[in-house]
């Protein structure tokens, strides 16, 4: 997917990029690849692959969660790595207020430099573990309209990292690939225990590559019990699974 095909694919979804936004994506790509030569940010570096598997893929939640397009949501992105999905969403929908949490400081350094390069405002980057960022005494607990995570762990684990950060009435949106149905089948306990309710599992394929993708939307319907998230590492070692 070259930049022109990227623009056309988004237009087909009712998203029209401005010339400024197209340039921001071009600059994002150049800076990502240049930085990646000395900091391991991504294994995907060819331009068509970055545009498809990072940029386009990151924007797919807006195909299913229309509030992303118009509302000034507070969005927290857990384990965003090189900024996916939240920074492509921020470029296209600048009214979003974006917070990124990542456990590796070198990624946070990259994100700060990238945000300056792209002239992004309304973004904040935190070097922290998600378990601590949304912990029972944390200022950010239940503080966000929307929390996103992209393929960083299976659904039962992601739910424990992300749902504590979502306001009651807000949503957790997970960007997943294959195996999502299997993960959801054993994640009901985690989702319910943490105050969530499965609202949608939207299955589709990426253009060009045809790779399977899922957008999983979980509504936050009640407060997360104080004992969650458990201490760093525990959600992964002892997941809340059915």
Swiss-Prot record:
Family: Belongs to the methyltransferase superfamily. RNA methyltransferase RsmG family.
GO molecular function: rRNA (guanine-N7-)-methyltransferase activity
EC number: 2.1.1.-
Residues holding S-adenosyl-L-methionine: 79, 84, 130-131, 150
Bridged cysteine pairs (disulfide): none
Protein name: Ribosomal RNA small subunit methyltransferase G
EC top class named in words: transferase
NCBIfam families according to UniProt: rsmG_gidB (TIGR00138)
